[in-house]
């Protein structure tokens, strides 16, 4: 994954009922659907969709802070909505998320100077993100315990191209698909563990998949 580790089944079914090729609704839906990497703004939210091009992945921007992603035998992808630049804000999200294999639902983002990729993992599939990571302790936040980890990626994709950078992880011990994440608690916990955060780039509530299939419909605020 762009990490330890990308979107048309449910959307196309609805489109078949509500919109026909050439209709205004069909054209508008097509504008919102993405199958290749792209970033931008939609309904006041920043969105980011990155895919390595493997398998079938369709990302669709919905109303407000909502997005949908469907994937089938994907390579690796990360997609979601949020903010650019990020801040130490409380992030609220809700919806449905499921995968038959390796995937994460997380508050995800980057900093620069230093270049850091960070994850606050709310739920994950068959692959435990703590595998091979250095455990740095725990933090209590939003009614749960999160385990803190650090890893290093070498010559990997990043917001600055191929680079070597650290990943910071905060992994919730009890999985969930809705709630509020007080991001400041996690940023402070990483700092207290001796990890340096740089200047905030973007932060999204992300769905990520790696060599798996699944679907997600998430609303952020």
Curated annotation (Swiss-Prot):
Active-site residues per Swiss-Prot or TrEMBL entry: 117 (nucleophile), 208 (proton donor)
Domain GH11: 33-221
Pfam families: Glyco_hydro_11
Subcellular location: Secreted
Catalytic class of the enzyme: hydrolase
Alphabetized GO MF terms: endo-1,4-beta-xylanase activity
Primary location: secreted
Signal sequence, start to end: 1-19
GO biological process: xylan catabolic process
EC id: 3.2.1.8
Pathway where it operates: Glycan degradation; xylan degradation
An annotated GO cellular component: extracellular region
Alphabetical UniProt keywords: Carbohydrate metabolism, Glycosidase, Hydrolase, Polysaccharide degradation, Secreted, Signal, Xylan degradation
Recorded catalytic activity of this chain's protein: Endohydrolysis of (1->4)-beta-D-xylosidic linkages in xylans
InterPro entries xref list: ConA-like_dom_sf, GH11/12, GH11_AS_1, GH11_AS_2, GH11_dom, Glyco_hydro_11
PROSITE patterns membership: GH11_1, GH11_2, GH11_3
Family listed: Belongs to the glycosyl hydrolase 11 (cellulase G) family.
Protein function: Endo-1,4-beta-xylanase involved in the hydrolysis of xylan, a major structural heterogeneous polysaccharide found in plant biomass representing the second most abundant polysaccharide in the biosphere, after cellulose.
The protein, known as: Probable endo-1,4-beta-xylanase B
